[in-house]
Amino acid sequence: MTSRPAAKSPKPKSPKLSRDVIINAALTFLDREGWDALTINALATQLGTKGPSLYNHVSSLEDLRRTVRMRVIDDILQMLSTVGTGRTRDDAVMTMASSYRSYAHHHPGRYSAFTRMPLGGDDPEYTAASHAAAAPVIDVLASYGLTGEDAFYAALEFWAALHGFVLLEMTGVMDSGMIAPGVGSEAGRVDTDAVFSGMVLRLAAGMAHRNDPGGNP
């Protein structure tokens, strides 16, 4: 008796495409492959389809990338708002800073997307969204007595410091393998968490004295 060939397993169905499905897939793609690798064809391959199918939902690569950036900004806004709720001064600043750092490390591709367009660019919607993302920080700075332009500039300084630290970590320049000068042993390895906490607390101390007549500028 001749045995029948085993039936082939059906191929898993590709997800039904929609704009949300495509954008969510792009976010996942970013963290695995990076911003520069994000193309229509590469994303279509991840979704198990062909590039032209995506054009039914996104008009171009620029449309895709812009929408991804807007989503990332909104994610960061929601994250900062959530962790900052009910907190003030140093407690809020440290919690927000730590959450920002954690987001960048867990979502490196998305973080790269967040920093790819200048705040003063030609896209008013993107600029407005970026300013909105700073709002939770500016709200916390009010607990230090900072408002208006003072609060906005303090928020920019805070963000610049966080971004610089995160970038040094993500590029491998700042890591736990660093040895403090003059120590030269395992005991002298740099505690990057302690460096980060110290930096944030010094920034917070500066905010507390920013409006003092004899305080730090």
At which residue positions do the language-model features occur?
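Alpha-helical DNA-contacting segments of helix-turn-helix folds
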Residues: 30, 64-72, 114, 122-133
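Amphipathic alpha-helical segments used for helix-helix packing
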Residues: 105-122, 167-178
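A glycine-rich, hydrophobic loop/mini-helix early in the fold
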Residues: 50-52, 56, 64-83, 87
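Hydrophobic alpha-helical connector segments
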Residues: 81-110, 121, 131, 148, ...
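N-terminal intrinsically disordered/low-complexity leader segments
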Residues: 1-17, 182, 211-217
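Amphipathic C-terminal alpha-helical segment
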Residues: 160-180, 205-213
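Helix-turn-helix
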Residues: 21, 25, 29-63, 67
